[in-house]
Structures are given as structure tokens and as C-alpha cells.
Amino acid sequence: MKRTPVHPVNPHIRNSFVSDFYLNLKRSGRGRLILRMLEHVLGTEINGSLPQRLHLPHPYGILTGSTGKIGEDVTLMHFCLLGPKDPWYQGDSWDNLFPTLEEGVYVSSGAKILGPLTIGAWSVIGANAVVTEDVPPFSTVFGHNRILRTTEGGDPRVRRYLDSRQKAQ
């Protein structure tokens, strides 16, 4: 798995090997039986398209919708949910029912992101937060839709990383 300075490899966390194995199985499409057994053991079901750089430090209990979009450098902690908002949906299409996570979003453990909304780039979703509204870039969300907006452009490490990417292009 490709790593960035935002998510360096930590040799002391063995779960990253499990998550890398899971993501490689998911991307390759091979080993369906092993993939299903691993999903059953981990309690994780990640559907839809996967980015090249998705970070799952603790790959347990993660559920994502089939049409949700996940950007590069996103971190999903354990027991987070990216799902539809309306449990009694009777419409014709499931195309726009799941959230979109832009680049660099960090979703803490137990967070629920519900509905067809967009989480802005490099935002942080706090533990056990429930998000049902759009979140602007470089914001922090906690509780139930408590959004703290920042105008400084986020963490200095993230700014340095983004600046170095722009210089490389």
C-alpha cells in the first residue's frame, strides 16, 4: 500500500498488515472466499470504489455504502459508518444516498456519517459524532452536527504536505 507523510507506516501496529491484506484482496477481485471470511471476522464491509491511499489503522466494524465516494489519504477508524440517512427509503435509485469523503478526511471511532452529504477535504470527524449535514474543508465535527470551521487551513503538517505536492507538480 502506498503511504504518505500524513500516514506513515508504524511497525508496532500489526493491524495495518491486516487492513493492507484486506484492501489488496478487495482491489484485486481475487480470493473471494478469503475476502468474505475476513469480512466476517473483522465485521468490516467496504463497498464501492477504493482510493489508492486509504488508511485503516484498526479495520474492525467499518461499514460503507456501495455508492459512497472516498478520497485519497482518508483514515477510517474502527466502528465507523458511512450510510444512508433514511431507513425507509422507497425510491428508484440508490445512487445519491451515501456520503462523499474528500481528500484527507479523518473519521474517528464510532462516527456515523449519514445521508448524501460531502465532508470537505482534511476535515476531522470526532469519536461518536453523528453527521447529517455538509462539512466545509479543514473543519472539525463533534457531537451531533457541531461543526468548528477553521480559516487557517488546518494542521501545519497537512499544509506542508499539500505545499510539497504542489511544488512537485
Locations of regions flagged by a protein language model:
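C-terminal catalytic lobe of FAD-dependent flavoproteins
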Residues: 46
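Left-handed beta-helix
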Residues: 42, 52-53, 57-60, 65-66, ...
